[in-house]
């Protein structure tokens, strides 16, 4: 492979690469090349390609060095020619930086080395050439420390130990009686270099390398090695960056911001990364190296006068003190500022996105070290995209694709005040199950959440080992939910997301004692009534009350949603069980209800007694009496839903969970039911025990209930049809779709459809009127997917219940997966939680097969998805490619799904 080009040079407004070569040169290398080509002042250098990273892991360090040597030596000569300095020279030594750069930005995840090329001879030459020995020795000290850490592995022996270099620095400062690194003299710095080298020799058994070429090869290989360090691996997992991409290595001539009062270093953004405002902003430090800006050793100053004045006001600093002690770059170096401002404008217009730029001013000359598309908040993301669309920088399609669907979550939920969160005490961390911020007093039981709200008007934090459907009302009345057990798709997580309610689940360190009503965690004891705060976006739980603020859904958000609707070809519905849920979903742009779970209605108010009367009855007659009480309640619920959706389709799922979920479990409830039904307490206890199942998720539930107790299906069908006809009579169009759950055999579905059709015809005869309705099924049993051609003979639509379909296909319990999921992710057995991200190769194949077979029988068959995957962007993309008509998700995930559907359509084109 001798003809393969592995090194690309840049400098003096020329480059062998360009900005489109991100896969080969990484984001940093591609942008450095592109900045050269458009005339931006960039220190010369070269980039070693990402392909060499793969060779490093397949061929080994020594082989890669030999392969690279000719090209790297030639590229270094190019830097020497452009700078007038020579690598390893005793008079005019060239110093370089060595940095990583993957195709996707991974800030801070991999290692960087500055001032490479320094040795005992070079430091004297630099001191003589600059007339600044302190600068020279400080640069040497920094290099030995950085190289020792990154390349030579000079780490603390144990986690309790201090960094070996920092320990030496602290000892030197104590010896000299000073507090800051900047107070150390030239002689102090010389002593530090000697001590650093001695520490390297003692810990590694090797001398610190003096040869610049040995230093360079060590650094290049260390950067490749850092691609597989723990933090880089974790970052890639969190951001879905494939390990096979690899990293490039960029080697650049050093420029120094710490050469005196006419030098500086800084970081800037072409727009505000927090708000999206079109305001140039950033920070800089005079006479400093890049790391000093973020190290907090000195107070960085603002680049613009406006920014400087805003900062001073926030710090209660007078204008007089600001101007004298913390002036802006514009005031200190007006000519350089003007050039920097012109460059940031040029870069933003050229790259057509908000830019994050790093710069150094060396002796009055401005150099750009990096530019990249800046990271931003969800609010800033939307504002920048819509502003750039209005400014004519980008078109509609680019504006839509520029906005990440998952980041919309940040706009839809309350958030913590940024200042308050910095001072908050984290007591435990769980799973970020539902985004948002919540603060309130702790309660342990659902009824107490209701009670606290009713008596004080204050919403509480409901803390449970795990939640159940009976906790629904309490969850609704709570500010947030915290559970010790359960994953991202546990009951608490799913219901909380549907409510737009903040939730942290699976906080396994919590020791919850219901009897004493206390939580013990990490040395803290929290009692009922004590305040805690939940961060549903990070999973962190804070002690006490942390201030929150409402998220602002601006006009830009609405405009983005309009554009998403314009380009998406797949519809988005919502999973909604109440008129309030439906109204919220409609406000977010849902085009129907893809799942209304009728059982959630059974837990409200006095209804639960009627439900319990029905399940505890010994015969059909008794069940029918109880169902007669439920009929008007269910009918009223459906009327509210149909009205809220204003003519959009509504899928109502018939009763799905096993009956034991509704059973009275406490002695108080059981005695109450005995009195209501006129039977003995012992009879109630016996019936509850009879209802208990060993494996209820695969037991007497779904269509199996409707087929063994047809009167349940009859009542629900009547409630649905009558409600639809009542709403139709008010002039509102109604599109009813009745869904039969847990079908695995077409005969099960046919039996249920016959009941529904019979009841519908009875109601039509009674009313002397008709409505259109459809009967379909939930595909959640694998057998239904592989026999979809038979199922479609009966079903008029399919809705994939991917929560249960995932459970039954993978054999994973979604409530217990948290026990082994982290290990499976770490070992790369699974790439993602299959209950969050659809398993395309397994569950996805069943979906594709069912769609294909179903439409083979019934070409016009409408297919959708109603599991939690319906709101996850990559799963929405899969649904688009699989040919589904719609996805359905929690109301607060509707905007995310709409944007993801638009992305899928645009990316396919």
Provide a role label for each language-model segment.
Residues 1-424, 458-461, 468-473, 479, ...:
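Nucleotide/phosphate-binding sheet-loop regions of phosphoryl- and nucleotidyl-transfer enzymes
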Residues 14-22, 434-477, 843-859:
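C-terminal accessory/binding modules appended to enzymatic or scaffolding proteins
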Residues 46, 484-486, 505-508, 596, ...:
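Short beta->alpha connector loops at strand-helix junctions that form conserved
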Residues 70-73, 238, 400-453, 458-461, ...:
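Long, charged amphipathic helices and adjacent flexible linkers at domain junctions
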Residues 99-100, 553, 563-909:
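Conserved alpha/beta-domain cores
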Residues 231-269, 438, 446-448, 455-456, ...:
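Flexible, glycine/threonine-enriched loop-and-boundary segments that flank and lead into catalytic domains
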Residues 365-367, 461, 468-476, 480, ...:
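Glycine-rich phosphate/ribose-binding loops and adjacent secondary-structure elements
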């Amino acid at each position: 492979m001798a003809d393969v080009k592995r090194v690309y040079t840049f400098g003096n407004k020329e480059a062998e690469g360009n900005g489109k070569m991100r896969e080969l040169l990484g984001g940093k290398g591609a942008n450095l090349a592109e900045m050269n080509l458009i005339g931006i002042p960039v220190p010369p250098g070269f980039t070693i390609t990402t392909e060499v990273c793969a060779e490093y892991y397949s061929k080994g360090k020594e082989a890669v060095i030999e392969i690279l040597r000719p090209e790297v030596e030639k590229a270094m000569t190019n830097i020497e020619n452009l700078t007038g300095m020579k690598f390893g020279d005793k008079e005019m030594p060239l110093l370089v930086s060595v940095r990583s750069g993957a195709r996707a930005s991974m800030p801070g995840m991999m290692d960087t080395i500055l001032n490479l090329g320094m040795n005992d001879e070079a430091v004297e030459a630099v001191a003589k050439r600059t007339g600044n020995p302190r600068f020279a020795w400080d640069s040497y000290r920094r290099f030995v420390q950085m190289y020792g850490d990154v390349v030579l592995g000079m780490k603390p022996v144990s986690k309790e130990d201090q960094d070996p270099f920092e320990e030496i620095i602290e000892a030197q400062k104590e010896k000299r009686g000073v507090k800051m690194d900047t107070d150390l003299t030239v002689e102090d710095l010389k002593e530090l270099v000697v001590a650093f080298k001695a520490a390297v020799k003692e810990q590694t058994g090797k001398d610190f390398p003096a040869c610049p070429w040995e230093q360079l090869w060590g650094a290049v290989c260390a950067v490749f090695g850092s691609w597989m360090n723990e933090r880089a691996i974790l970052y890639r997992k969190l951001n879905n960056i494939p390990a096979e991409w690899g990293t490039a290595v960029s080697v650049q001539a050093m420029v120094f911001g710490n050469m005196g009062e006419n030098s500086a270093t800084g970081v800037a953004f072409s727009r505000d990364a927090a708000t999206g405002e079109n305001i140039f902003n950033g920070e800089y430090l005079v006479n400093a190296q890049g790391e000093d800006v973020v190290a907090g050793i000195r107070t960085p100053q603002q680049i613009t006068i406006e920014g400087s004045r805003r900062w001073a006001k926030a710090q209660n600093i007078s204008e007089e003190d600001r101007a004298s002690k913390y002036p802006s770059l514009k005031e200190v170096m007006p000519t350089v500022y003007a050039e920097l401002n012109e460059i940031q404008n040029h870069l933003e217009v050229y790259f057509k996105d908000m830019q994050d730029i790093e710069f150094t001013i060396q002796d009055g000359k401005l150099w750009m070290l990096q530019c990249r598309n800046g990271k931003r908040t969800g609010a800033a993301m939307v504002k920048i995209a819509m502003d750039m669309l209005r400014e004519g920088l980008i078109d509609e399609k680019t504006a839509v694709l520029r906005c990440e669907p998952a980041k919309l979550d940040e706009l839809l939920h309350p958030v913590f005040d940024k200042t308050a969160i910095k001072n908050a005490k984290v007591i435990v961390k769980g799973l970020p199950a539902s985004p948002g911020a919540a603060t309130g007093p702790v309660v342990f039981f659902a009824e107490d959440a209701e009670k606290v709200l009713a008596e004080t008007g204050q919403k509480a934090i409901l803390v449970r080992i795990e939640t159940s459907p009976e906790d629904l009302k309490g969850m609704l009345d709570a500010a947030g939910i915290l559970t010790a057990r359960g994953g991202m798709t546990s009951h608490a997580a799913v219901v909380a997301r549907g409510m737009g309610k903040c939730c942290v689940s699976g906080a396994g360190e919590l020791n919850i004692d219901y009897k004493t009503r206390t939580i013990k965690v990490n040395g803290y004891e929290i009692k009922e009534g004590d305040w805690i705060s939940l961060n549903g976006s990070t999973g962190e739980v804070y002690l006490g009350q942390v201030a929150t603020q409402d998220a602002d859904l601006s006009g830009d958000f609405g405009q983005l949603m309009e554009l998403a609707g314009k380009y998406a070809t797949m519809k988005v519905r919502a999973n909604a069980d109440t008129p309030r849920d439906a109204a919220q979903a409609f406000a977010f742009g849902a085009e129907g209800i893809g799942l209304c779970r009728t059982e959630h209605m059974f837990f409200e108010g006095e209804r639960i007694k009627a439900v319990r009367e029905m399940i505890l009855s010994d015969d059909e007659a008794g069940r029918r009496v109880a169902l007669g009480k439920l009929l008007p309640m269910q009918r009223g619920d459906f009327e509210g839903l149909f009205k809220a959706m204003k003519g959009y389709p509504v899928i109502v799922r018939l009763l799905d969970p096993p009956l034991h979920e509704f059973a009275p479990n406490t002695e108080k409830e059981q005695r109450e039911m005995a009195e209501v039904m006129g039977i003995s307490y012992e009879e109630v206890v016996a019936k509850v025990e009879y209802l208990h199942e060993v494996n209820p998720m695969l037991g007497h539930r779904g269509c199996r209930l409707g087929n063994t107790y047809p009167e349940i299906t009859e009542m629900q069908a009547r409630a649905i049809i009558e409600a639809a006809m009542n709403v139709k009579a008010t002039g509102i169009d109604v599109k009813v779709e009745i869904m039969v759950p847990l079908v695995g055999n077409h005969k099960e579905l046919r039996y249920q459809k016959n009941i529904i059709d019979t009841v519908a015809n009875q109601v039509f005869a009674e009313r002397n009127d008709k409505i259109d309705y459809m009967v379909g099924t939930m595909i959640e049993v694998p057998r239904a997917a592989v026999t979809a051609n038979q199922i479609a003979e009966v079903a008029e639509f399919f809705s994939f219940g991917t929560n249960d379909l995932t459970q039954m296909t993978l054999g994973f319990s979604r409530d217990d997966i948290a026990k082994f999921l982290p290990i499976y992710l770490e070992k790369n057995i699974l790439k993602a939680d299959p209950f969050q991200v659809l398993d395309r190769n397994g569950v996805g194949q069943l979906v594709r097969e069912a769609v294909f077979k179903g439409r083979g029988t019934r070409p016009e068959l409408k297919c959708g998805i109603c599991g939690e995957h319906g709101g996850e962007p990559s799963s929405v993309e899969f649904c688009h490619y699989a040919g589904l008509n719609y996805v359905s998700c929690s109301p607060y995930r509707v905007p995310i799904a709409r944007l993801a559907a638009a992305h899928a359509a645009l990316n396919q084109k």
